Amino acid sequence: MKNSIKIFALLLLFSLNSNAQNNYQIKKATMFSEHAATQLELSDEDQKFIYETYIAKFMNDRENIFGKDLSKEERQAVYKASSKKLRQSMKVRFDQPTTAAIMKAVLELQKRNQ
């Protein structure tokens, strides 16, 4: 009985931690997509696409980095690869100038919030 309570408590802690990390990623993706859509006067559908693309990037980054004890250089390589993949995904829906403008708007927001 005590072991099952301990296991339940441990699982609860893990799920709360995971949920908090997911909430952070959702907040960040929402902020990025709203800012880019506002700056570039994009449609709601375009904003949703940007949001989903950033969520996929953040989840992929987390999956490839979290708990893997990577060096700083290895983490940077993961981030660089995921940023390249993000740009490629954006180019599926947007032309090159729009993609560049979205990335610039998000970068400006990141710098402003640091």
Short names for language-model regions:
Residues 1-25:
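Bacterial Sec-dependent N-terminal signal peptides
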Residues 21-114:
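Charge-rich (acidic/polar
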